[in-house]
Structure formats: structure tokens, C-alpha cells
Amino acid sequence: MYPCTLLMVLLCLAIMTHGHIQIHGTGMRRNRRDSPHPPSPIYDSFYVPKKGWDETKPGTVLASRNIQAGFTKTQKINLDGAYQLLYRTSGVDDKSPSYSVTTVLVPKNARPNKLVLIMAYEDSNFVECAPSYKIQLGAPLETNPIQTVEELMWTSVLNDGWTVTIPDHQGPLSAFSSSFIHGHASLDAIRATLNFEQLKLDPKSAVVGMGYSGGAIAGGWAASLLGSYATELNVVGWSIGGTPSNVTGTFYGLDGSLFSGFSVAGVAGIVDSYPEVNDYVGSVITPAGNAALQFTREHCMGDIVVGLQNVNLTGKDFVKNEKNFLTDKRIAPILDHLTMGTDSKLTPKVPVYMYHALHDEVIPFDRANQTANAWCKGGANLLFQEYTGIEMGHVSTEVLNTPFVLKFIRDRMSGREFLNGCQWKSDLNPLWRPDILGARLTEVFNSILNFFGTSVGRTDRIIQESIINHNFTSK
């Protein structure tokens, strides 16, 4: 069986079993004002800042509101409050004003001087796929099984008493893979959360950031930009896994594959955030290629993977004359600029925990390893955990390594020493020991395992059966 991973795209197993899945679109046809769901960001005035917003400082709270978070109801999490903040941030550079929304969840047992930045994977260019929308009670994606698994992991963080902030780190255009937008929006979400007076958080609160896969784009770039963009923040650690650190390498790695929709979405995100890229790509792309880009702007991840399989970015169906536009002099320098580790001045200044499966079939291991080496040469303090077992793929690494991510958060919050310099560790697979985290979290991990079955791996039939019995495309 072809290896299939990534929590959000396990639906590919069902595709192989049934031959096809009909796409249930998450696109514009859902954006009706009379919808029973919470209003789409397209129609929700909360997402639009008032005049003069661009004259404020990054991290300024422009608007706030209370919300109900759907998964906290199903997981029976006792929250003290759930808020959304519209805040000022920056775009592709710090001279380009932008804005975004972050969702703040405060558990009853919250500690006043601790904050966890959770960077969710979105991997789409459609605003209705942003965390701030799909988290809301009654949102179309709120009960999607794929969404549920990631939220089970967030539950672990909340159960530990950490206030969390979950930004729409792709910005108002949902510009997937536009690295600096991801990083700026993540750092400014921290600022906005600390600035939100109702929370009464200590401005010097210890902060740990965590992100996997598409969320690791945000995490890696937030770590890179912290030392130059948000020096006042007391970030004490970054956890990033399955990291797409090299945009170009990821595009090539996924090109023409079952997961090529991610490449198309990445191209769309860069096209939408860099006018010069938009102009050039617009001149060489075919109508079918343009339709593929537009598809990613109107659908969420599940539909993108199903609808855009085996797309070749340099093929005749996507680009005129089968031109490799990624190497063009008008685009290649920008893609290089968006690669983690190419600028030594952007080396992370606080501890970094990276983890990656050697046989990751979605995000290339070698590229993440290269970034780790570059950061270490720049003086980073970094632990790189490699999993070499053949059973370890993209999804199994995220799920099974969760206890060690949470242990990293705990250690950083408690002020434990981190290694001085860099270390590479290699194991077949994570040591599955929920007891590391305390008995009260066992139920959370059992919920994750029960969803997938007792084993999680590249040939797991139990996962396949779970997918077949659920609708893994968005509604």
C-alpha cells in the first residue's frame, strides 16, 4: 500500500480503497449569509479592522469578542474564557502593515505567567479553513474527524493549565507557505494576547511555541524572526516537527504525487503575497493551472488533496511550454529568501526542539535536517530527534511524539536547563509512555489511540477502516 500520512490527509487511504471520493466542496457555495453556521470570515465584520488600524504598532488589539470553542465542549474542558482578538501584524516584511485574528483559550487552572502559542496546520488558501473559524462551535469543520485529532492534542496543553493562543498565521489572504507572513502573525499573536487587558497576563510571561507540518512553517519562522522582530517577548522554547523548511524542496518533493495539492496551495500563497510573483506566474500559467490555484482559495485541505492529486507544476497542463517557473530569476530569489536557515542572522536565539521521521513521505527529512545544521552553525541551541523506524511516517510521528512535545513545554516552563549547543538523537520510534505526563492525561492519549486503533503506522488497516467510516472531506 502506498504510504499515506498527515492527520489532515489520511483520507487518501479511503481514496485508494474506493478508487475515488466525491469532493464535498468547502468553497464559495457555502458562503451564504443565511447559513446555519457561524458567519464566514468573508461576511463577518469582526475580521475587518477599522480605519487607522495600519497606524498602530504590531501586536495592538484592534477588536475582541467572546466565542464558544466547539472542541472544548466535546472534550469537556473547563474554560475560564474563550476569546478572539483582531490584531495588527506585518506582511512579507516589517514595513508592510497587515492584520489577523488569534483565538485565546484560558483554562480554569490557568497560570498567569505562562502562555503556549499553538500554530495549527491549515495548508489551504481559503479563509474558512483558518483556525479562528473552524474552532467556533457550529463551524462546518468543527466536527470533522481530522480536525478532532489535532484538537485532542491541544486538549493536552489546556489540561496542563497553560493559556493558549492559536493565530490565523497565514494572514488575511490565507497565504500558505509565505514564510514571513506566518512568522510575523505568530509573534504578533503573542503580543496581542499579552496586551489583552482582560486576561491580566504578565507582559513577561514565559512563552513556548509549538507547530507541526504546516504549523511548523509558522513555528520555524517565528523562531527565526524573534531576535529581530519581537525582542521583548520572553519566548523560552520552540517545538517544531515535520518541518517544511525549504519551500522549493517541498514543491519538488510533492510534485506529481498524491499530495501535490500542497504544492499548488503553496504556489498560490506566494503568488497572493508577492505581486512580482503574481505578475510572472500569471503570464506563464495555463487556464487549468490557474483553476488549480483558485481551487486552493476556495477549499480546505481535505478537498485540496483529493481534488489536486498528481499535479505537475512544470507539466503542460499547469504551465505553458512546460516551463520550470520555479527556477526563473524573478521567482527563485524569493523562494530562497523563504527557506529557513539561509540567513545566519535569523538563527533562533532560544531552545529549539525539532523532530522528524527519516521516512516522512510528505515533508522531506533532508531539508529539515539541513535547516537544523544551518541553525547550529549559526549558534542555535537545538535538539534534533530523528525517528528511523519504517513504521514512522508523517502522522505517526506527530501522534506518537506528542508526550515528548508536552514534556519539552513543561521543562521550558519550569526553567529546566536545555542543552548548550546542538544534539542529534536517533531512535526507531518514540517511547510510548503517557505516564511521563501524569495520569490525568492518559485519557487524552487513549482518545487519540482509540481513533486510530492500537497502532499507528504507514500500513495500519485500523486507520484505513476509521477513515472509510468517516467523511474526511470538509462540508
UniProtKB/Swiss-Prot annotation:
Gene3D superfamilies, A to Z: 1.10.260.130, alpha/beta hydrolase
A GO biological process held by the record: lipid catabolic process
Signal sequence extent: 1-19
Disulphide bridges: 129-300
Reactions the enzyme catalyzes: a triacylglycerol + H2O = a diacylglycerol + a fatty acid + H(+); a monoacylglycerol + H2O = glycerol + a fatty acid + H(+); a diacylglycerol + H2O = a monoacylglycerol + a fatty acid + H(+)
Keyword presence, Disulfide bond: yes
Glycan attachment points: 246, 312, 369, 471
GO MF terms held by the record: triacylglycerol lipase activity
Residue positions of the active site: 213 (nucleophile), 360, 394
Enzyme class: hydrolase
Alphabetically ordered keywords of this record: Disulfide bond, Glycoprotein, Hydrolase, Lipid degradation, Lipid metabolism, Signal, Virulence
Alphabetized InterPro entries for the sequence: AB_hydrolase_fold, Lipase_secreted
Entry EC no(s): 3.1.1.-, 3.1.1.3
Pfam families in the record: LIP (PF03583)
Family designation: Belongs to the AB hydrolase superfamily. Lipase family. Class Lip subfamily.
Cited PANTHER family: LIP-DOMAIN-CONTAINING PROTEIN-RELATED, PTHR34853
Main function: Secreted lipase involved in Dandruff and seborrheic dermatitis (D/SD) probably via lipase-mediated breakdown of sebaceous lipids and release of irritating free fatty acids. Has triacylglycerol lipase activity and is able to hydrolyze triolein. Mostly converts monoolein to di- and triolein, while free fatty acids are only produced in low amounts.
Record-given protein name: Secreted triacylglycerol lipase LIP5
Organism: Malassezia globosa (strain ATCC MYA-4612 / CBS 7966)
Gene: LIP5
